[in-house]
């Protein structure tokens, strides 16, 4: 079973991603990982920290000459600002002189005014901290860099095993007019990445940028909606047999686990609830290569399984909780009214969030693909996939024959 985990703090020495269960023979390089990390750092409305964060990638294990070995893959992303934070975030106790010097450091000042909407308050109470630093260091969205590194391996596997491409675009930011056209294709990705807000439409881009500029002027932050599309998936990934095996439940859990994500929908999602059944589902017809559909309202999933249509997943990101126009809070050291702490942050991180949602979708799809087809090497997995696809084609053959007879 494919598993992944990350470790590290926002201002710590490094972030680490560990991927276990990947087959041997998948071609992936540290350059590809760095390229995906660079995509995560894109976006209009990002804060000054993006100029400081430099994602230095080191693959510690699991790859040899650009190919996976079948063992655990460990990836390190170094923090180039570590020398500034070494004393604050040191793993071991400091000597008395260093501790005395740190006592007067602004970086080490206790953070006792939790930010509404962040993990600060509940984390301090749950874990018994008198300072929000230990909470915000791990709760920070900086952790998603490690997920993107892990997801790069999953992307490579999906592309090489199935020919699957996973891409994303921003649907809306704040109150901007949402994009409601057809989903993008792989050839559209360079243009999307070239957009400052990762928009698939020029008018939508202008509306999003205007929203960001207005929020920046007002000292505020913005959220938005992103869409991920996965193309080339076979029929039958996931299962109807139990709730935890349904692919939509796995995708929803993975995407909701991303910092600041507050909602997930598959296909037309909540809009489907407003329709009658005759307008909510995707009717099937015999086609030249089997069953075809005229719509994809289900977003590629029916009964917890892929149905051969493009997978469409949308996620709603809330506005960043570190608001320059500081929100009211309570100082947990004194119990007095206060304004929330303000760390260096972005006005809008929705374009970056789209890349992270891509990552989590790719990881889940890689996991269910390996669960379905198994194998110790990429070549073995491919053979299993090809045998299954032949079987599916045979089952669909009557529909193709019916279409041919009709004409």
UniProtKB/Swiss-Prot annotation:
UniProt key word Lyase: yes
Single GO cellular component term: cytosol
Keywords: Amino-acid biosynthesis, Aromatic amino acid biosynthesis, FAD, Flavoprotein, FMN, Lyase, NADP
Residues where FMN binds: 138-140, 259-260, 303, 318-322, 344
Region span, Disordered: 275-308
Known EC number: 4.2.3.5
Listed SUPFAM superfamilies: Chorismate synthase, AroC
Cofactor: FMNH2
UniProt function note: This reaction introduces a second double bond into the aromatic ring system.
Name the UniProt record assigns to this protein: Chorismate synthase
Encoding gene per record: aroC
């Amino acid at each position: 079973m494919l598993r992944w985990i990350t470790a590290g703090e926002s201002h710590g020495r490094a972030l680490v991603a560990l991927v276990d269960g990947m087959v041997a023979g998948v071609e992936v390089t540290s350059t590809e990982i760095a390229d995906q990390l660079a995509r995560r750092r894109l976006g209009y409305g990002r804060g000054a920290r993006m100029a400081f964060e430099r994602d230095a990638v080191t693959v510690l294990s699991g790859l040899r000459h650009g190919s996976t070995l079948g063992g655990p893959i460990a990836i390190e992303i170094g923090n180039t600002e570590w020398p500034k934070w070494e004393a604050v975030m040191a793993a071991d106790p400091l000597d008395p002189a260093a501790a005395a010097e740190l006592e007067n450091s602004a970086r080490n000042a206790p953070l006792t005014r939790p930010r509404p909407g962040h993990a600060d308050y509940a984390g301090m109470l749950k874990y018994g901290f008198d300072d929000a630093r230990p909470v915000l260091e791990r709760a920070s969205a900086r952790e998603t860099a490690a997920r993107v590194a892990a997801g790069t391996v999953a992307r490579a596997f999906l592309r090489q095993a199935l020919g699957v491409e996973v891409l994303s675009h921003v649907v809306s930011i704040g109150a901007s007019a949402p994009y409601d056209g057809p989903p993008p294709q792989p050839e559209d990705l360079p243009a999307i990445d070239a957009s400052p807000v990762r928009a698939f439409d020029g008018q939508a881009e202008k509306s999003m940028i205007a929203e960001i500029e207005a929020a920046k002027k007002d000292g505020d932050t913005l959220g938005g909606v992103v869409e991920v599309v996965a193309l080339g998936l076979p029929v039958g990934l996931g299962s109807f047999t139990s709730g935890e095996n349904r692919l939509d439940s796995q995708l929803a859990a993975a995407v909701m686990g991303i910092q600041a994500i507050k909602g997930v929908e598959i296909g037309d999602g909540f809009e489907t609830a407003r329709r009658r059944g005759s307008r909510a589902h995707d009717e099937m017809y015999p086609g030249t290569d089997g069953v075809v559909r005229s719509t994809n309202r289900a977003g590629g999933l029916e009964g917890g399984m892929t149905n051969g249509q493009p997978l469409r997943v949308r996620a709603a990101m809330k506005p960043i909780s570190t608001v320059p126009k500081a929100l009211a809070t309570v100082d947990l050291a004194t119990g007095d009214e206060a304004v929330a702490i303000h760390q260096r942050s972005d006005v809008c991180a929705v374009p970056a969030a789209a890349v992270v949602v891509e990552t989590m979708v790719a990881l889940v799809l890689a996991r269910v693909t390996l669960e379905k087809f198994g194998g110790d090497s990429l070549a073995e997995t491919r053979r299993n996939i090809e045998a299954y696809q032949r079987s599916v084609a045979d089952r669909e053959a009557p529909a193709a024959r019916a279409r041919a007879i009709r004409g």
